[in-house]
Design a protein with these regions (language model features):
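Active-site-proximal beta-strands of protease catalytic cores
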Residues: 322-331
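C-terminal juxtamembrane segment of a hydrophobic transmembrane alpha-helix
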Residues: 1-13
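Acidic glycine-/aspartate-rich tracts in secreted/extracellular proteins
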Residues: 84-88, 167-170, 330-336, 347-348, ...
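GGW-centered surface loops in extracellular recognition modules
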Residues: 40-91, 215
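Short, solvent-exposed loop/turn elements at domain surfaces
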Residues: 87-96, 170-176, 336-338, 350-353
Length: 378
């Protein structure tokens, strides 16, 4: 029998897949070793890499069109988000700014808002300072604006920025509020780093090693730029990609109504508004929840997954932007006492109501099991 489940062809296919995985693992280890030796900034394919990073050079991860991946010496991976410095993107700011004064920054920001207008959805939310007396937040408007202008200048000059390939992760599951001493990682098969407030997430993001570059939560415009980059690179292969990003993210994220396939990692069942406490290997079946590594679309039932557990959520080598956990940004909702903003929906969200472009506002003390974050480097 050649084509049966235990047939020669199936075994050959499985062997080939295992060989390819092993080969990629070896390439990752080599890239990590190279990263440890890169004590200064390096250049690769026209991009400036932070100190301590190297490209993985793995097929499918080695071009801006696919999503170029870099790693540090410990396996933390980031993806380049291209923002071309062209007259189409910067019609007002222009492409040859020599003096970065206040007017220049205003023009850059406004042009980027126009460039990403589909994903702003006429929002009134802005990247402006919101007062917060929580320890670790920007002390005043001047400090916030300085950080924003640093980001805008870097995006303009370098034509993009690095974003965490994965949601910020942690090796041991957080079961509630508590100390946040563990530095977040950007690796697959980690528990999403949840039960953190917006300010706690920013403090953690700033602690991530990024050489002489800056690590931070994303500003609102950066989140929109990630979506625009995905749209630009995917629109030929997925003509409806902008609708999936902006109207209904069912097929690109982990929502309760999604039917994602699990490829690795672990999951925990969410049913009737209750999150379970038993994390299962991705190959484990739970009737009406996950069967044959496929999430079953049962109303009111979902799964919370470890980082990068499903290729269904992979867009340009960036995992889980849509669904799984909400992700804090440092945008301002302008909503009285609820000025903190998170994006993208979660495993307990409905995809049409909470697509990846969706914004929502919360108070500065909000933390929850379905709220996490992602780190950007620029």
């Amino acid at each position: 029998m050649l084509t049966g489940q235990n047939g020669i062809l199936n075994r050959a296919s499985e062997a080939k897949e295992k060989t390819e995985i092993a080969s990629k693992d070896e390439q990752r280890k080599l890239a990590q070793a190279e990263a440890l030796m890169n004590t200064g900034k390096t250049t690769y394919k026209g991009l400036i890499l932070p100190e301590g990073f190297a490209p993985t050079k793995i097929e499918g991860e080695d071009s801006i069109d696919d999503g170029l991946v870099i790693t540090d010496g410990y396996g933390n991976e980031y993806v380049w988000v291209e923002v071309p410095r062209t007259s189409e993107v910067y019609p007002t700011a222009t492409v040859n700014i020599t003096e970065f004064n206040n007017d220049a920054y205003i023009n850059i920001e406004n042009d980027l808002h126009t460039y990403t207008s589909l994903y702003r959805n006429n929002t009134s939310y802005t990247d402006t300072y919101a007062e917060d007396d929580t320890s670790g937040w920007f002390k005043d408007e001047s400090e916030y604006n300085e950080a924003k202008q640093k980001m805008l200048k870097s995006v303009y000059e370098n034509e993009g920025f690095w974003v965490g390939r994965y949601e910020a992760g942690i090796s041991e599951l957080r079961g509630g509020a508590g100390e946040i001493t563990a530095i977040p990682v950007s690796k697959e098969n980690m528990y999403p780093y949840t039960y953190v407030t917006r300010t706690q997430a920013e403090v953690l993001a700033e602690k991530v090693e990024s050489g002489s570059c800056t690590s931070s939560l994303m500003f609102g415009v950066q989140w929109d730029l990630v979506l625009k980059y995905i749209e630009n690179k995917k629109e030929e292969k997925i003509p409806e990609i902008s609708k999936r990003l902006n109207e209904d993210s069912e097929y690109i994220g982990n929502y309760w109504n999604s039917k994602i396939k699990l490829n690795r990692g672990k999951y925990v069942e969410y049913k009737a508004g209750i999150l379970g406490n038993l994390w299962n290997d991705y190959t484990t079946d739970i009737k009406g929840c996950v069967e044959n590594q496929q999430k079953v679309n049962t109303e009111g039932t979902g799964i919370f997954i470890t980082t990068g557990a499903s290729e269904s959520t992979n867009l340009q080598n960036i995992y889980d932007m849509a669904g799984n956990v909400w992700e804090w940004t440092i945008e301002n909702s302008e909503m009285n006492q609820e000025k903190c903003v998170y994006r993208g929906g979660a495993f307990d969200s409905y995809s049409r109501n909470r697509p990846v472009s969706f914004r929502y506002y919360l108070p500065n003390n909000h933390l929850y099991y379905s709220v996490g974050f992602r780190v950007a480097i620029y």
